[in-house]
From Swiss-Prot:
Compartments, as annotated in UniProt: Cytoplasm
EC main group: transferase
Region spans: N-acetyltransferase: 245-429
Subunit organization: Homotrimer.
Pathway it works in: Nucleotide-sugar biosynthesis; UDP-N-acetyl-alpha-D-glucosamine biosynthesis; N-acetyl-alpha-D-glucosamine 1-phosphate from alpha-D-glucosamine 6-phosphate (route II): step 2/2; Nucleotide-sugar biosynthesis; UDP-N-acetyl-alpha-D-glucosamine biosynthesis; UDP-N-acetyl-alpha-D-glucosamine from N-acetyl-alpha-D-glucosamine 1-phosphate: step 1/1; Bacterial outer membrane biogenesis; LPS lipid A biosynthesis
Region (Linker): 224-244
Source organism (scientific name): Campylobacter jejuni subsp. jejuni serotype O:23/36 (strain 81-176)
GO MF annotations, alphabetized: glucosamine-1-phosphate N-acetyltransferase activity; magnesium ion binding; UDP-N-acetylglucosamine diphosphorylase activity
GO cellular component: cytoplasm; membrane
Record's protein name: Bifunctional protein GlmU
Keywords: Acyltransferase, Cell shape, Cell wall biogenesis/degradation, Cytoplasm, Magnesium, Metal-binding, Multifunctional enzyme, Nucleotidyltransferase, Peptidoglycan synthesis, Repeat, Transferase
Function: Catalyzes the last two sequential reactions in the de novo biosynthetic pathway for UDP-N-acetylglucosamine (UDP-GlcNAc). The C-terminal domain catalyzes the transfer of acetyl group from acetyl coenzyme A to glucosamine-1-phosphate (GlcN-1-P) to produce N-acetylglucosamine-1-phosphate (GlcNAc-1-P), which is converted into UDP-GlcNAc by the transfer of uridine 5-monophosphate (from uridine 5-triphosphate), a reaction catalyzed by the N-terminal domain.
Length: 429
């Protein structure tokens, strides 16, 4: 049975206390709404998102990554509440999966389990450790009797710890029939989607409660809950990669972005941060190193190294206090304390301590190209644009501002001067 998916993301999110809309808050470098959309499009090609607060800003991000998403706008003034969000929604398929925009931890497998039940109305519920302000779910004889919003619950109902996860699967025809019957006769004067359960019961519709994991279906309302959710997501990411064969030393100290990929046998030491769409292939990343949007293949990086965006390393050693940016290094050794930016360095080349590619002239960035089997002495500066051909020796302390031909020795030093007995003349008068 085909499914249409609707994601509710129109709320103000005032408790998040941010100028950025709640659904654009990031976990593991990806906004909440993008995490949910990735799972939604894995299940259906008919996905809609309901927006209102900062609609243009949220819509721009959604369509950048998921251009096939249908965007709807909720009239919060006239139709507030979760049921009001469905006004104007026209599903293309036989049933509808309704999700919340602040649930980035939900797994695709859990949604598939929810969809595997063929009841006309399925409701995701969980046993809450601390029910707090969740809506309470009353279940009798394996069927949901009603959902009571916390604001409207009596003392007895507040004792119930079976709570509404806010995720529904409903027959499209049933939704179309019941939605116009929902009213706003409640304390908040809102149109509650939860009322659809009461209306379905009045029509003797079987409502199936599907129990799910509380942590996975947690909604995020403030920055504290955001941090909890990110911790859960980090644990999932690292557990997955460890099951694929990656070794993490002290994994709790390491940050791995949601889009990072590991291939083959990799080893990651403590306090490492790997971001963006980085790809690590058969490599070792040592302590306290940072890698941003870079590819590392058959190499070792660190400790205390920094690969800024667009680096490509192959068969290369990057040591401590080396920073690279937009650098392509193939079979290179850069052991310590260097900046290699906007450069290409070929096989067999050794970069001495204190080497700098001076790539910026105050207006534009320029490139340094270094060939094969080049020996670069310590404390060398390359004034880009500059090209060093194969099998060159650059003497320590040189400033290279011209191209160097193959096989040459390049030396550029100020003439030394030594004044005899100067110390005694200055201090022992």
């Amino acid at each position: 049975m085909k499914t249409s998916i609707l994601i509710l993301a129109a709320g103000l999110g005032t408790r998040i206390k941010s100028q950025k809309p709640k659904v654009l808050q990031e976990l593991c470098q990806k906004s909440m709404i993008l995490h949910i959309l990735k799972k939604a499009f894995a299940l259906s090609d008919d996905v809609s998102v309901v927006l209102s607060h900062q609609k243009e800003r949220v819509e721009k991000e959604i369509l950048e990554y998921f251009p096939k998403t249908q965007i709807l706008e909720q009239d919060l003034q006239n139709y507030p509440g979760t049921a009001g969000a469905l006004s104007g929604f026209e599903p293309k398929n036989e049933r509808v999966l309704i999700l919340c925009g602040d649930m980035p931890l939900v797994e695709q497998t859990s949604l598939e389990a929810l969809l595997s039940n063929n009841a006309k109305l399925n409701l995701a519920v969980f046993k809450a450790r601390d029910p707090k302000s969740y809506g309470r779910v009353v279940i009798k004889n394996d069927s949901v009797e009603k959902i009571v919003e916390f604001k409207d619950a009596n003392t007895q109902e507040k004792e119930i710890n079976t709570c509404n996860a806010g995720v529904y699967v409903i027959d499209s025809r049933l939704l179309k029939e019941l939605l116009p019957l929902i009213d706003n006769n409640n304390a908040a004067k809102e149109y509650y989607l939860t009322d659809i359960v009461k209306l379905a019961k009045e029509k003797d519709v079987m409502i199936k409660a599907v129990f799910v994991d509380e942590d996975e279906f947690m909604g995020i309302n403030d920055k504290f809950e955001l941090s909890i959710a990110e911790n859960f997501m980090q644990e999932k990411i690292k557990k997955y990669w460890m099951q694929q064969g990656v070794i993490f030393h002290l994994p709790q100290s390491t940050f791995i972005g949601a889009d990072v990929e590991f291939v083959g046998e990799c080893e990651v030491y403590e306090n490492v941060r790997i971001e963006g769409k980085s790809k690590i292939i058969n490599s070792i990343i040592k302590s306290s190193s940072v890698i941003e949007n870079s590819i590392v293949e058959n190499s070792d990086v660190g400790p205390l190294a920094h690969l800024r965006p667009n680096c490509e390393l192959k068969n290369t050693h990057i040591g401590n206090f080396v920073e690279c940016k937009n650098a392509k290094l193939n079979t290179v050794k850069a052991g310590h304390l260097s900046y290699l930016g906007d450069c290409e360095i070929d096989s067999g080349t050794n970069i001495g301590c204190g080497t700098i590619t001076c790539n910026y002239d105050g207006v534009k960035k320029h490139k340094t190209i270094i060939g094969k089997n080049v020996f670069v002495g310590s404390d060398t500066q390359f004034i880009a644009p500059v090209k060093i051909e194969d099998e060159v020796i650059i003497a320590a302390g040189s400033t290279v501002s011209v191209n160097v031909e193959k096989g040459a020795l390049f030396i550029n030093r100020a003439e030394h001067k030594m004044i005899k007995d100067y110390y005694y003349k200055k201090f022992q008068k």
